[in-house]
Every structure is written in structure tokens, then in C-alpha cells.
Amino acid sequence: MTDAPLVTAELPGSGGSLRRSPEDFRVDEVPAYLPSGAGPHLYLRVEKRGRTTRDALRTLARALGVPERDAGYAGLKDKDAVTTQWLSFPAARDPEPQALASEGLRVLEVSRHANKLRPGHVRANRFQLAVRGGDLARAQAAAAALAERGLPNLFGPQRFGTEGRNAEVGRALLLGDPSPEARRAARDRFLRRLSISAYQALLFNRWLAERMADGLFATAVAGDVLKKLDTGGLFTCADPAVDGPRVQRFEVSPAGPMFGHKLRAAEGEALAREERLLAAEGIQLSDFARGGGEAEGTRRAARLRVEVALAPLEDGYLATFELPKGSYATVVMRELMKAGAELPEADED
């Protein structure tokens, strides 16, 4: 991630450090919908400190007397943080919140809904991050530039595993490599999905880095697949003179490739750019068919509108901002700090 492009590269970073104490790293999940108040599934909004989402699910399922496999969550939240999120359980009774409290875990709200929570049932995540020793004035200048220019929607380093090994295994799997690691990933659905998604993310980051290097980050190219940032709808750019200003106004964004055998195709110049990237990698779109349902492909917005609110602390500053699901706070903090921005984020995709 240290060699990933920056949209505020000419501005000095704030410096400072992001400590890993839970209180310095707060994440509030913004759900895709709120529970209706009625239904067979118990919904609990919880706050946790120093515990993973899976640990919280296990603890609460045991206390409620339901199988852990039947519990639901919308996204994984990291252990080294203070986080809030909704969890669901097929429980008949409504418990007292105090009765479910345990070390590092408390229940904030109790409700009900018709369906189980599932991964992806989240709209966004709201972050509050303390930067110790950071220069507030420098952070403010970078935040202002970021709000105007847009955030490159890059994947954070946690997506790729230790030293990028997950992505390497994903590429090997798609190419039919007979190595032991690739064969093991092919047999294990979780490892297969993890490895292939890491490789897809690596290719997306390279595609976006090339767009930025060529001055095409905040505009449209003929044949681009564009994404409406309010609804998520996709369409193909027929006239960059028409759609380019819409990109600049954050109405739409170029939608980069998460390559797969069912990927919506770009056209013209945009397609040629994607084909050159695959050729440089020595892989073809048809190779992704080896990944089956884990490698169908999709489109991801390349540029996001992000406004960072900054407040002074005695020894630094507090950064508050919201990102859509699947986007990484690490990317925002690199723009502000320029160094020392590694974050203990859980990978939710």
C-alpha cells in the first residue's frame, strides 16, 4: 500500500501515529435498513471493545441458547477498536440488555425483524480516528483537497494478506497452477473466495493507478462503464464531453473492473485499457471461469466524495468521516498523514 498513488501527493502529510488502543479507533456501522420491531429474528445493536465480531456472535448466541451458525451480521468489525453494529439471532424471547453484557461487550438496543442479517446488509461505516502527534493544519489542507478532488477507492493492504500472498494464490488458481497452495485453495471454498477476491482487488488497484497516472481519475473515457453514486446504477459512456462533467460533480464515477467471467464489458478506449492490463498480467478474462461463482466479476466505483471533519486534540487531531461499505479508512488516512496510516481494519468483502 505504501506505493499506492495519492491524489494529494504534492501536499505535506500531517504525520503522527494511529495508536491501536480501541478508544483511538471507533467505527459505527450504518445499516442498509433498520429493524421493523416485529418478526422472528431478534436484532441487537451492540458495542464492543477488544473483541471480534465473530467472538461477540458466539458469546451472544450461547447466552440466548441458539446455534452460532444461525446468528447474522452485516459486516465484520475489527478487534482493536470500539465498534457498534447490529447482530441478529432466531430467538423467541426479548432479553434484558444488561443480562447479555460481558467484558468488552454491551447491548445498546433490542428490536426485531422479519429476516436474518446477512453480509452486505450495510450502507456505510462511520469512522472516528485519533491521530496522535499529527499536525492539524496540514491535515486540514489535505482534507480540503481530498473533498474537492475525490478519494481514490483503492483497496487497503489487508485485502491482500501477508506480503500480498493471497493475491498470488488467486492468480495461480485462475491459471490452473498445480502448486500445493493453489490446489488447496481450489478445494476450500473460503480460501478460494479469499484468494480470488484478493487478486481481483490487486488488478483493480493497478487499473486505478494507471488512470490516475494518465490524468483520467476525475473524468470519463469513451466506453467507460459509469456508476451512479446515488443509486448504484451502471451505464456506458457514449460521450465523454457529456459524462465528464458529471464525474467531476460526483454524480457518477468510472466503475473499474473487478475482473470475472461475467463482468459487464466496457467499450472502445476504456475496454482497450482493461485488455492491456490483463495482457500485462498474462491472464485472460476466460481464465476467471475457473473460479466459478467466486469470480463472476463486478464493477467498483473508482472515485468517491469524502468529507473529513477534523477537530483538535491535546496531542494531535480527531478525524471523522463516512465511507460506503467495502471502502477503506486506510486510504483516507494515507492522504492526510502520508505515513504511519496503517489501520487495524477488518476486511468485510
From Swiss-Prot:
Keyword annotations: Isomerase, tRNA processing
EC number: 5.4.99.27
GO biological process: tRNA pseudouridine synthesis
Source organism superkingdom: Bacteria
Catalyzed reactions: uridine(13) in tRNA = pseudouridine(13) in tRNA
Gene3D superfamilies, sorted: TruD, catalytic domain, TruD, insertion domain
GO cellular component, one term: cytosol
InterPro entries documented for this protein: PsdUridine_synth_cat_dom_sf, PsdUridine_synth_TruD, PsdUridine_synth_TruD_CS, PsdUridine_synth_TruD_insert, TruD_catalytic, TruD_insert_sf, TruD_pseudoU_synthase
Region of interest (Disordered), ranges: 1-22
TRUD domain: residues covered: 150-304
Residues annotated as catalytic: D78
Entry's Gene Ontology molecular function annotations: RNA binding; tRNA pseudouridine(13) synthase activity
Similarity comment: family membership: Belongs to the pseudouridine synthase TruD family.
PANTHER family: TRNA PSEUDOURIDINE SYNTHASE D
Function description: Responsible for synthesis of pseudouridine from uracil-13 in transfer RNAs.
Name of protein: tRNA pseudouridine synthase D
Organism annotation: Anaeromyxobacter sp. (strain Fw109-5)
